């Protein structure tokens, strides 16, 4: 077994991968709130980190991030549709755009299901997106995002 250089920049960088600051949706608007615990950011890892990353990818506008560290095509095109009149075709396009974003994520093995619902009783959100995926570690992860 090769020795590990715990002080190397590569080790420190890779140690932080798949660890994220926990975010949760604000039910009253289309924003997300950072979560805190004991006066500091709440950090999630593993499958919670993947669920968090999926939410971030879906909620980020396509090509919104200008930082070269990120892929220039990061984000989801659903935001082009949120002002369109509600219809079944718009729901199918939202599902298509979300599926494309999830298929690009390295930690996702299979996109099992995307369901887009019409949030008729919610004035803050027009649509709900439910996702069900299988991670590269063969764990099934589900979650949802409101648009």
State where each predicted segment sits:
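Immediate N-terminus of the mature polypeptide
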Residues: 1-93, 100, 112, 117-147
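Acidic-histidine catalytic/liganding microenvironments
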Residues: 105-111
């Amino acid at each position: 077994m090769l020795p590990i250089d715990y002080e190397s920049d590569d080790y420190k960088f890779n140690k932080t991968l798949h660890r994220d600051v926990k975010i949760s949706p604000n039910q009253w608007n289309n924003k997300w709130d950072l979560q805190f615990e004991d006066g500091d950011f709440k950090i999630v890892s593993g499958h919670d980190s993947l669920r968090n990353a999926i939410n971030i990818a879906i909620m980020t506008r396509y090509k919104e991030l200008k930082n070269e560290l990120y892929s220039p095509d990061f984000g989801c095109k659903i935001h082009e549709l949120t002002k369109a009149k509600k219809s079944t075709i718009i729901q199918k396009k939202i599902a298509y755009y979300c599926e494309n974003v999830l298929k690009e994520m390295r930690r996702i093995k299979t996109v099992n299901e995307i369901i887009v619902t019409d949030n008729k009783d919610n004035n803050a959100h027009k649509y709900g997106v439910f996702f069900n995926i299988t991670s590269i570690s063969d764990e099934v992860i589900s979650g949802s995002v409101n648009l």
